[in-house]
A protein has these predicted regions:
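Inter-Walker segment of RecA-like/P-loop motor cores
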Residues: 353-395
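Interdomain helical connector at the RecA1-RecA2 junction of SF1/SF2 helicase-like NTPases
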Residues: 223-228, 461-510
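ATP-dependent helicase/translocase motor core
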Residues: 2-8, 14-333, 342, 346-358, ...
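Conserved N-terminal glycine/acidic-rich loop preference
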Residues: 296, 408-409, 415-418, 428, ...
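Conserved SAM-binding loop
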Residues: 336
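Structural recognition of the conserved hydrophobic beta-strand(s) that form the central parallel beta-sheet
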Residues: 191-194, 383-386, 410-411, 448-453
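Conserved helicase ATPase motor motifs in RecA-like P-loop NTPase domains
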Residues: 307-308, 416, 437-460
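Conserved RecA-like ASCE ATPase "motif II neighborhood" in helicase/translocase motors
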Residues: 380-439
Length: 510
């Protein structure tokens, strides 16, 4: 056997986990059948699950903990993706358990399965060579990662000394596991493949082309002088970051897919996990929005600039989900703006409506009257509309101030096409006329504005306003990823690229 083989990569991975504060071990000893596991078919370490439920819910009786265990173990579907969604919901939202209130009436309480507020209060474990026997198949994933006893990560590693042991072979092995030992994926959050040189991650439903590297640990610098596997593991599995991914960067979506057997399109539940550029951009955009919407904020959330193929639509979903949950925003209202009905239908119907991550159901405004009604609500709401619904009526009726709340956030898709025209000009009949963006701002005077665009905002024919630009590329391009702050984007012409100032956020090379 080569001195540098698959076992070497496994041990290196365990060392990286140990540096993150995980307990590590050798599964034949530390997850032995007969002592730790009742059966080789057990993929969950139930003693650790029980211990976590008791520790994280000190007021829960042993009976309640037992009921929670039964709820976790009780399958509701034979479909692995549906079961994965069920376990994900239990991890994020808690395990519902029936009990009695102080007055003797039936009540439902949620027992925490994960402590999201104190990451180190959870039980973190990584084991290699974990043998699983299921449906007559005996398989041994290279490394399993456990959170409070649940196998949330799976690593498939190949021998870097073997030129035939490629990333594709590692992905193929995961497909074998999906068909032969599907139970290991029921609680799974992330799968990782590596050939010892390259490393990539995705959800277990991801095709090979959807596995992507994670190129930064802290979101500031791309690391090229350390192993890709180390960067990925320390970037994704650091406890605080991993829990952020679990709660805010995993989306299940009912989408049309091609059935390989029949050749027909059908709808299926797809699981997506954010790629590294989506993760860091969303967190930067959320913090920028919170700053801009605060008492001393300037209401300019910034512009997220993408190139094609970088996952803008789902990034907007992640942004909405995380911002809506942030207590600093006090249950905000989000208004998503497009400049065409077909784009409004597409973003709402194909991306947001099927996405099972949002804390409330998005609504598409059908007309000006409904939009006005939706925007007068006291709090909350994810509203979709075209900018034209802010236009004056045929009788000259303009929008009144619909709400003066500061926790209203307007998100403009392809912002370069709609966020201009802030000044009044004389029309051909000598009447003052303002652009749609001004009418929208008049109706929402204290709203914060965030833009998404795939077009560089530096042309001279638009007055797009923003205070910061977060630029993103596709994962395959060789362009730089960076966040820049513009001095002020308030003149009649967009500022040229030379005026951008770099601020602390990723300066990344893809």
């Amino acid at each position: 056997m080569s001195a540098f083989d698959e076992n070497t990569v496994e041990l290196a991975a365990l060392e990286y986990f140990a540096e993150l504060g995980y307990c590590t071990g050798y599964a034949p000893v530390d997850a032995a059948v007969g002592s730790v596991r009742d059966s080789p078919s057990d993929v969950t370490l139930w003693d650790r699950v029980t211990s976590a439920l008791s520790r994280l819910n000190p007021d829960a009786s042993p009976m309640m903990v037992g009921e929670a265990l039964k709820r976790i173990q009780r399958a509701e579907s034979q479909d692995t993706v549906l079961e994965n969604q069920r376990l994900h919901d239990l991890m994020v939202n808690g395990v519902p358990v029936e009990t009695k209130a102080a007055d003797g009436q039936p009540a439902t309480v949620l027992l925490r399965l994960v402590d999201f507020d104190r990451p180190r209060n959870n039980d973190w474990l990584a084991l290699n060579q974990f043998t699983i026997v299921e449906n007559g198949h005996n398989r041994r994933p290279d490394v399993l990662v456990f959170l409070n006893g649940l196998p949330v990560g799976l690593l498939e590693l190949k021998n870097p000394a073997n030129e035939h042991a490629t990333m594709r072979h590692a992905w193929n092995q995961i497909q074998t596991y999906r068909s032969q030992i599907p139970s290991v994926f029921v609680p799974n959050v992330v799968t990782v493949i590596s050939d010892g040189t390259a490393a990539a991650m995705s959800s277990f439903t991801g095709g090979f082309e959807h596995y992507a590297p994670w190129k930064t640990i802290d979101g500031r610098d791309v690391i090229t002088n350390r192993p890709a596997l180390e960067v990925l593991l320390k970037g994704v599995f650091a406890p605080e970051r991993f829990l952020d991914i679990v709660r805010n960067f995993v989306v299940f979506s009912d989408e049309p897919v091609m059935d390989e057997a029949s050749g027909q399109r059908r709808r299926a539940l797809i699981k997506r996990v954010a790629k590294y550029h989506q993760y860091w951009a969303v967190n930067a955009a959320v913090e920028s929005t919170i700053r801009a919407s605060g008492p001393d904020g300037d209401r300019r959330g910034g512009v997220v600039w993408h190139t094609q193929g970088s996952g803008k639509s789902f990034e907007m979903v992640f942004y909405a989900a995380k911002l809506m949950r942030d207590p600093r925003m006090a249950n905000p209202t989000l208004v998503f703006i497009t400049d065409r009905n077909d784009l409004d239908d597409q973003l709402f119907g194909e991306v947001f409506a099927p996405a099972r991550i949002l804390p409330e159901t998005p609504i598409q405004a059908e007309g000006r009257d409904e939009l006005r009604s939706l925007l007068t609500r006291a709090s909350g709401g994810i509203i979709f509309t075209t900018i034209h619904k802010f236009a004056p009526g045929e009788d000259g009726d303009t929008n009144p101030v619909l709400t003066d709340r500061r926790n209203v956030v307007v998100v403009a898709d392809e912002a370069h096409r709609s966020q201009y025209g802030f000044s009044e000009t004389l029309d051909s009949q000598g009447r003052l006329k303002a652009g749609l963006a001004k009418h929208m701002r008049d109706a929402l005077p204290n709203a914060t504005f965030l833009g998404f665009t795939g077009t560089p905002i530096e042309s001279n024919d638009r007055s797009t306003r923003a205070s910061s630009v977060i630029t993103l590329t596709s994962m395959t391009s060789r362009a730089r990823l960076k966040t820049v702050r513009q001095s002020r984007f308030t003149t009649s012409h967009a500022l040229p690229r030379s005026s951008w100032l770099t601020i602390p956020w990723p300066l990344l090379m893809t």
